[in-house]
Each structure stands twice: as structure tokens, then as C-alpha cells.
Amino acid sequence: GANDAIRADQVAANEFKPEAKWAESYRQAGFGAVNAHIADGLARGSSVLLAPLGPETPAAIEAHHPEGPGAQRFILRKESGAYWSFEKGSSTQDYPSSLMGCIALLRQTLYDEQWYRGLGKQRDFTDLNLDNIGRLSGLPQFFVTNNKYDILRAERIAKEFNRSFIYKGSGEEYMYLDAVRALGRPVVLPLRFPEVPDLSDPVEARRIGLGSLVHWDQAPANAALLRKAGVPIALTSNGLDKMDAFAAAVRKAIAAGLSFDDALAALTTTPARLLGMDSVLGSIAPGHYAHLIVASDTLFKADCEIRTVWIQGQAYPVKPWPATPTMASGRYRLQGDLLA
């Protein structure tokens, strides 16, 4: 029978409800587009690509969504990707009760989908989960991992079923750098790094293992090490407690060796390409969405402040410029970085 850990019929766009604070937090961090999915189950259905718009509804945006000024105007692409994981999620069924069981159920489901698809017109029943696994197979396939081993486990499934996964990393990829590089697959990296170990209590300090200390030291360099190894990367805010910690986390990755250009690409052109949206997102070009950032300095510098974020041609003030008594005349050069 059906297993509740298989939720391929979930459509994140159908569950999205606009929240002003949610949208504002992403705008203040400089985001013009956000990819979101329902993080529940082994097969998680489709994600939605959203624009974190404000309460204003410009006519130009409204014209694209004749349904009205509701959630639709936030949606850049209703189904932007299919998501998978080794996590059972909220299912209350006994099975699966282990990682091995999760892998077995995922493989069995993919075999079932192959059989179901092969029946063609002879099929006299409908299975929504299997229908949706097949229907979503043409979208980018994202696999969410939780540790350094999950990518290797998931890649075996990818080869078994002739799939290509984009991996949402755990932050531990540097530990298996050669193996990850050999896969040749993109990795979306989190920016949540370990807290500084508390060594003030000698007794507690003895319980902190060497592995924990090494991970605390090396985790910020994860992105830099993968890029130097030639692994395509994107960066995600997923895992951060607050969006206002995002810029500091990127700065930490840059301080650990990630170049500014690689950091910028990992937040603009690369994610747009992975989502198949690079014809309208990720760079400043004719025909692209007018998503721009106006900042006081080069992005991610310690003293850089985002002043205005433009989304679909609509300006959203973030922090006003300091008041100046006069306007200085002269010739100026406009220079900008795009954060999609």
C-alpha cells in the first residue's frame, strides 16, 4: 500500500501564503528570488520559485497575473524543481524506521514508477505519487543531504535510475572532497557554521572531540575548497536562524578563501542556471527581470549596507542613504552587482 513518507504529490505553490515579514527579511538580505519546497518526506514534490514582493502591487506585475493580487503575483515559476531526501518526515507509519529502510523505500518507489509508467494505456488505476514522480522528472532534481555520506548514497540511486541530482549539501563536503569532485554534480551549500566551542570549563572541554574542533575550523572553507576542486556550487540561506545573519555568513566564507566572484556567482548566475531560469534571472541583461541591488559599497564588504532592492522593476528601500546637505555635481560611474 501507499506510504506517507512518499509525498511526490505535494505542490509547494499551492501551500504558499504571502507573509509580509517573510518577504521583507529576504529583501533586506538582498534576495530578488527565493526557491522553496515543503521539507517533508522522502519524495517531496515540487518547489516554487518566488519573488519576495512587498505589499505594493504595481500594474506591470499585476498584468502578468490576471488572477488578482493574491499569492500568484509572488510566483515566478509554479513548479521549479523536484525534491528528494533520506528523511521520513512527518509520516506516523512505522515503516521506514531507519536510514536503510528509507533508502529501500525510495528505491522501491522509483522501481514502482518505472513499472507504472511502462503500463501505459493498459493501466486501469491511478497513483498520484507515481504520476507526479514521472510528471516532475523533466524538472531539476534536488536531493537534500544531512551529512557527508548522503551524497554518495544518493548518487548510487541516481546511477541506478538514470537520474541527475543537484545536491543540497550538509556543510561537510570538504571531508570527502575527492569523492564529491568525482561525481561532477553541483552542490548547494548551507552557510550555517558551527558555533565557537566553549572551552571555559576544563571538564566540558575534554568532552569536545577533535573532529568537532576540526569541523569548527574547516567548515567556513567548505565553499572555497569545493570551488578550487572545480565543483559547481550555489549558496543557500537555508539553515540560518535569521536572514540578517546571511551577509556575515557569506563574508565568513570569503574570509576562508572563497573569491568574491565565486560567491557572487553562487548567488546569482549559478542558481538561475540550475533552476533553468537563466534566461530571465541571475544577470543584468535585456529581457531579464529587473532585479537589482543598490548598496553603499561592494557587496559583502564589512561596512557594505544594502540601500535599495529592486524586484521586477519595483524599488524597495532597505536603509536610507545618509542625509547630505547638497548634491555634488560632476561625472559619475554606475556600478552594480545583482543578487537574484
Which residues are covered by each model-predicted region?
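Anion (oxyanion) recognition and catalysis
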Residues: 27, 159, 181, 227, ...
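His/Asp/Glu-enriched, well-ordered alpha-helical/loop segment
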Residues: 7-9, 140, 186-295
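C-terminal cap of metal-dependent C-N hydrolases
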Residues: 289-322
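Polyanionic/metal-chelating signatures
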Residues: 19-174, 305, 311, 328
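Short, charged, surface-exposed secondary-structure boundary motifs
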Residues: 61, 176-179, 196-203, 319
